[in-house]
Amino acid sequence: MDPNCSCSPVGSCACAGSCKCKECKCTSCKKSCCSCCPVGCAKCAQGCICKGTSDKCSCCA
């Protein structure tokens, strides 16, 4: 289990503030700790579920 993102196979997730998109394993977790990626960031868009608009994405690097 990821120390930054406590996710069970089923059910909800609890993410720490340090959780990054790539460390999130399930939908509710991604929603709670991923920012929305800018248009054109294909790599980020594949792994993130947006919760809001942002010009930066932590998993886009």
UniProtKB/Swiss-Prot annotation:
Binding annotation for a divalent metal cation 5: 34, 36-37, 50
Gene name per UniProt: MT1X
Organism: Homo sapiens (Human)
Gene Ontology BP, a term: intracellular zinc ion homeostasis
Name of the molecule in the record: Metallothionein-1X
Chain sites annotated for binding a divalent metal cation 7: 50, 57, 59-60
Keyword entries, A-Z: Acetylation, Cadmium, Copper, Metal-binding, Metal-thiolate cluster, Phosphoprotein, Zinc
Residues binding a divalent metal cation 2: 7, 13, 15, 26
Region Beta: start-end pairs: 1-29
Modified residues (Phosphoserine): 58
Residues recorded as bearing N-acetylmethionine in the entry: 1
